[in-house]
Amino acid sequence: MKRKKRYKHATIGKKKYYFYKIVWEDPCGDAGHADIDEMKKLKPATMISQAYIFAKDRRHVWTFSSYDSEAAVFSDRNCFPRSIIKKM
């Protein structure tokens, strides 16, 4: 029986990119008029993205979800500010 891999990754070129589930907060807005009660009800949405980590530094995380198996070409790309990421 084949053993399950501990971490899912993709090898593109000679580099491994690891797959993550990223929980992050998306700011929400409304351009209409609102009273105090409606204003306090406005909360950010908790979003979940599943993607490979391309790179990260102390301020940002770059991800991709699709890639070309023949060349280092990436699609479905995002750049997340670290301040909105709640869990990886």
Where are these regions (language model features)?
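Conserved RNA-binding domains used in RNP assembly and mRNA/RNA metabolism
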Residues: 2-88
